[in-house]
Design a protein with these regions (language model features):
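NTP/phosphate- and nucleic-acid-binding module
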Residues: 2-4, 18, 29, 37, ...
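Long, mixed-charge low-complexity alpha-helical/coiled-coil segments
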Residues: 9-10, 453
Length: 734
């Protein structure tokens, strides 16, 4: 029996993937391969042939460094094993402590040598993670029960930092672009994700340990093995180049090709050394049963976008039927990752901030493009990647006019994404936009650029900006029978052929009873093309399926054909989607702002911009004497009235240690109430800036508003130092 799907008014060519000008020529050259390209980037048949230039110099360097570090690593491991054995044997605590001291000494020796051998931009992730954990920016979920890989809890500082990032995101995008907003359900019925393609295509390849059942994502397993393999000095350069080529082709490989690699290299479980099962496909969505009967299958949403798409008609109506418009949503999404790793970068539950910009497929210009036209960006095009070239810096206008970026709307959002990331503190030298190759493209995208941040884990995708064409709305039109279209007046009326189903309402009523109305509405909504196809199917097969209901010829005995004049055309809009991974941006921001004081390597801090810093200012009385209390209270109350989160630190520690504590958690400004504040009639205080540690002296009544302006970005610290005298020392000390 043929299944009949509702299909109407799909824009022709809407699913063709965009090709920049540099890929429209017939041939592309790489170091060892001259290949033909077809317009369809998503073709696995052709994509698997591509070769990329691979620079292995960093691999050679790492291998040489590791050779020098190997004896030190062995010494540390030897000491650690000895301590574990001593504890197992119940050795005296004092003896164990002595061994621990020796272990610390060896670890310090290894750490110093590592810093010496690696380039000067070496990042001390261990120190940053120590600060994150001590100050509870975030930690493993359910840690007291051993924790769960791929799940994290945000602490007070982490929550505030994320909230501030999202607040700026709302200002930067939702308010400035006058976007609509929705908040949709996390529990998603299966038909929705079946229509979107997630049920069939949202999967990774997985293998298991044959004895323990431990699961591994196959491409990650192969990559880890290969990277370790080519780090071996005994491996010839020719073999290293061949392995590097295979690493770059992993994303193109089929499940069978990956299975062949496992067998050829006799890969084992990295945890136990046991054999591995054959690969299987694993859908990354969390399945659920909705309701007590368990009959309604569903999933936890893998993205927030689908909630916006299924509400398109209501949003269009709210926007008075006009295009273009954009809708935003912030919320959690869920992906059942096979082997979560790299901290917050690959997790099973994460916050997304997504925008769906709906526009006409034949007009993707943007009215505000001129406002970002001169924005310079580092763009790593698909062409450059395939030719082994470096990313290029250019304006977004050059990229759009040169055909590198598909259209103005896509380019506009890319520029706005960069502005937002730089505003919250992402290092511009560690930010680039990389264009997806065809094999990387999501099943719904026709062009996509990722904003990537360089971290100690490498280049990490933090924001995706995709032209999803008309895919989603077309799919939901088929799946639901509801026309996800917009009407656009024609310049001139035109005559079209019309085909309308004429159902037998009595027969349908007897068969479907309470669902009869739903069936009749579905038949009434058929496009002429869909109705024609249905008539043909009923003639050939005798039955068809509409929206899950099986219909026979007796239920739809006839179809009416006529010509009619139309004054509007129905168009399924295209969608441009910026999608922000908040957790990844959060982690990249912490790495990019992590600092170690030059004069004291033990003093670490986060140089977070004031606009996103969890706490904006600290109030530090130099003494606990009662005469200080009114000034501290005055400052705290005024700062609170100005919506400035603050921390009062009146502990007995030295002022230097208190500065260090507030620096650690990223507080950008500190107000010190000293003896001059109390004793002088002017009642001045000092204001300290975290990064430079510079201090100025100013009247106590003026400092709260100055901090408000500093936090809002309306005032820069340089302007403050130019207006107020630099603080050197107190005039009074008691």
């Amino acid at each position: 029996m043929k299944t009949f799907q509702l299909l109407s008014f799909v824009t022709k060519g809407a699913q063709l993937r965009y090709l920049p000008n540099c890929l429209r020529s017939a041939e592309i050259f790489t170091s060892s391969l001259r290949e033909k390209l077809v317009p369809e980037w998503g073709s696995k048949k052709h994509a698997s042939k591509r070769k990329l230039l691979v620079n292995t110099n960093h691999l050679k360097m790492d291998a040489e460094i590791e050779k020098q570090l190997a004896p030190l690593r062995a010494r540390v491991k030897e000491q650690g094993d000895l301590i574990r054995q001593m504890k197992t044997d119940g050795a005296p605590e004092m003896d164990v402590k002595k061994l621990v001291q020796e272990l610390k000494s060896r670890k310090k020796e290894l750490e110093d040598m590592t810093l010496k051998l690696y380039p000067q931009d070496f990042f001390d992730r261990a120190k940053m993670n120590d600060l994150i954990k001590r100050r509870f920016f975030y930690d493993n979920s359910f840690a007291i029960y051993g924790g769960i890989t791929g799940q994290y809890d945000y602490g007070p500082l982490g929550c505030d930092l994320v909230d501030n990032m999202l607040t700026e995101w709302q200002k930067h995008f939702v308010i400035q672009e006058r976007m609509l907003k929705v908040n949709c359900s996390i529990l998603t019925p299966e038909p929705v994700l079946k229509a979107s393609g997630h049920v069939d295509k949202f999967a990774d390849y997985m293998v298991k340990d044959v004895k323990t059942g431990e699961c591994f994502r196959l491409d990650h397993l192969i990559k880890q093995y290969f990277e370790k393999y080519i780090a071996d000095k005994k491996v010839s350069q020719e073999e290293k180049d061949e392995i590097s080529r295979k690493i770059n082709l992993l994303d193109d490989m089929t499940m069978k090709e990956m299975d062949d690699i496992v067998k050829a290299y006799d890969l084992k479980s990295p945890s136990t050394g046991n054999n591995l099962t054959d690969a299987v496909e694993f859908n990354l969505m969390f399945p659920i049963s909705i309701g007590p009967s368990g009959n309604m299958a569903g999933f936890l949403r893998p993205e927030t976008a689908q909630g916006i798409f299924v509400n398109f008609k209501r949003l269009l109506e709210y926007n008075q039927g006009k295009l273009p418009f954009a809708c935003a949503q912030v919320g959690n999404a869920y992906r059942n990752e096979i082997s979560p790793r790299s901290g917050l970068l690959r997790v099973r539950e994460f916050t997304m901030a997504e925008i769906e910009h709906f526009c006409y497929p034949d007009n993707k210009s943007h009215t505000k493009f001129n406002q970002v036209a001169d924005t310079e960006m580092v763009l790593y095009s698909a062409c450059a990647q395939m030719d082994g070239e470096s990313p290029k810096r250019m304006t977004i206008t050059e990229a759009v006019r040169g055909g590198l970026v598909a259209n103005e709307t896509l380019g506009y959002y890319m520029a706005r994404i960069q502005q937002y990331l730089l505003k919250i503190g992402i290092n511009p030298k560690k930010l680039r936009f990389r264009q997806h190759l065809g094999n990387e493209m999501a099943h719904y995208a026709c062009d996509c650029w990722d904003a990537e941040c360089l971290t100690s884990y490498g280049w990490i995708e933090c924001v995706g900006c995709a032209d999803r064409s008309a895919y989603d709305l077309s799919q939901h039109t088929k799946g639901s029978g509801v026309r996800m279209s917009v009407e656009r007046p024609l310049k001139e009326p035109k005559i079209v052929d019309s085909v309308v189903a004429l159902p037998d309402k009595v027969a349908i009523g007897k068969t479907f009873k309470k669902d009869a109305k739903v069936v009749q509405e579905a038949l009434a909504s058929l496009s002429s093309e869909a109705a024609e196809d249905m008539d043909k199917t009923l003639n050939e097969v005798g039955e068809c399926v509409v929206n899950g209901f099986k219909l026979t010829r007796s239920m739809v005995p006839a179809f009416k054909r006529e010509q009619k004049k139309i004054h509007v055309e129905e168009i399924i809009p295209s969608v441009i989607e910026p999608s922000f991974g908040i957790g990844r941006i959060f982690y990249s921001l912490l790495e990019h702002t992590f600092r170690i004081r030059e004069d004291d390597e033990k003093r670490t801090y986060f140089a977070l911009p004031a606009v996103v810093a969890p706490i904006k200012v600290s109030v530090l009385p130099l003494s606990n004497k009662t005469e200080f209390i009114p000034f501290v209270t005055q400052l705290a109350d005024t700062l609170t009235d100005l919506n400035l989160p603050l921390r009062v630190d009146d502990s007995t520690g030295s002022i230097g240690r208190r500065y260090a504590r507030t620096d650690e958690i990223g507080i950008p400004f500190g107000i010190t109430v000293d003896f001059d504040t109390v004793n002088n009639l002017a009642h001045t205080v000092t204001l300290r800036e975290r990064n430079s540690t510079e201090q100025v002296r100013m009247p106590i009544d003026e400092v709260p508003l100055i901090i408000r302006h500093l936090a809002d970005g309306k005032l820069q610290w340089k302007e403050v130092t130019e207006k107020w005298p630099k603080f050197v020392a107190q005039e009074t000390t008691k």
